[in-house]
């Protein structure tokens, strides 16, 4: 089933999510047309139970879909909406909105307002599923105050106390950083493979001193390092999504996000090294991917944060060796 979903989405993105479309949405902040195409195809309901109108898939079955969001630099929150609609369905919400939903960790202010910094795709999302230390809300972005964040489609979003009260408050609570870590790891894995493939193709096409630069040993070494990181990240993302439910395991997500974030830094640097100056230009597609590698590396915590999560798990909650923690995390049949 996961291959069928991935293949169908790949065909849709080949037609509807070209680099030109990504550039247009980044410039305008309007992803409504692309979102309409994706939503009408049913992909956003992949994690919703069949009894509630969805496909009833589990997290490991939609890894391919989330990875494609990275491979095609999808500029609308498809993976986030899949997760959000599943959580809303679990909470018994009837009539889940059809618009796009992103996820964010927020902070309730003393005046009752709610602030979220660096909301992924906050410029284009129709709503945000926000969690603080105790509560969770579904809030529209229509009347919220949005200011640009570091990545072009992200935003800092602020809701007044009245807007928070008017929003939908859920009785359940989820750690959004955990969910975003899982999503970002999968997206990174797709983007990393795309960058590697594009760089490999460029090295075979670019001729210098009478032969493709990919024939030079120094370039071959850099490509081999990129391949190592890209495929290790893919395996790590598989581990992070190794769940039969929609909520991932915290330790496995920590491993996945840490490894994919490490790979993002190395692969982005090596790809630009091989491409040279052309890779940095606006007209060349590489920057669409490498900007996201850097953004997703930081989103939800970079590798240092997730290394800390693993260290805390070992010191505070486990007995035995570090190897025992690694074995338990990587034993996906457990």
Kindly give the residue locations of the regions a language model identified.
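Alpha-helical interface subdomain recognition
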Residues: 1-72, 181-334
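Generic hydrophobic, aliphatic-rich segments that mediate packing or membrane embedding
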Residues: 61-62, 80-84
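FAD-binding core of flavoproteins
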Residues: 73-79, 86-197, 323-334
């Amino acid at each position: 089933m996961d291959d069928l979903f991935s293949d169908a989405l790949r065909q849709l993105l080949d037609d509807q999510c070209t680099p030109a479309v990504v550039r247009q949405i980044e410039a305008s902040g309007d992803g409504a047309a692309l979102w309409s195409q994706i939503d009408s195809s049913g992909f956003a309901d992949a994690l919703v139970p069949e009894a509630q109108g969805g496909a009833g898939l589990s997290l490991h079955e939609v890894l391919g879909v989330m990875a494609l969001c990275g491979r095609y630099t999808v500029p609308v929150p498809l993976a986030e909406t899949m997760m959000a609609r599943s959580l809303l369905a679990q909470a018994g919400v009837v009539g889940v909105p059809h618009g796009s939903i992103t996820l964010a960790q927020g902070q309730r202010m003393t005046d009752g307002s709610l602030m979220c910094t660096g909301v992924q795709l906050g410029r284009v999302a129709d709503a945000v599923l926000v969690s603080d230390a105790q509560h969770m809300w579904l809030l529209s972005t229509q009347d919220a105050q949005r200011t640009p964040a570091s990545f072009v489609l992200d935003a800092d979003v602020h809701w007044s106390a009245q807007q928070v009260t008017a929003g939908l408050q859920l009785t359940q609570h989820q750690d959004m950083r955990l969910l975003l870590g899982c999503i970002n790891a999968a997206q990174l894995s797709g983007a990393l493979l795309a960058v590697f493939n594009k760089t490999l193709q460029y090295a075979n096409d670019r001729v210098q001193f009478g032969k493709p630069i990919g024939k030079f040993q120094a370039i071959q070494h850099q490509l081999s390092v990129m391949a190592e990181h890209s495929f290790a990240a893919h395996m790590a993302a598989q581990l992070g999504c190794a769940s039969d439910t929609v909520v991932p395991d915290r330790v496995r997500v920590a491993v996945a996000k840490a490894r994919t974030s490490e790979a993002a830094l190395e692969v982005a640097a090596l790809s630009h090294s091989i491409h040279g100056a052309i890779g940095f230009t606006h007209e060349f597609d590489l920057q669409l991917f490498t900007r996201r590698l850097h953004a997703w590396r930081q989103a939800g915590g970079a590798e240092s944060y997730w290394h800390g999560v693993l260290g805390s798990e070992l010191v505070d909650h486990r007995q035995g060796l570090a190897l025992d923690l690694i074995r338990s995390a990587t034993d996906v049949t457990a």
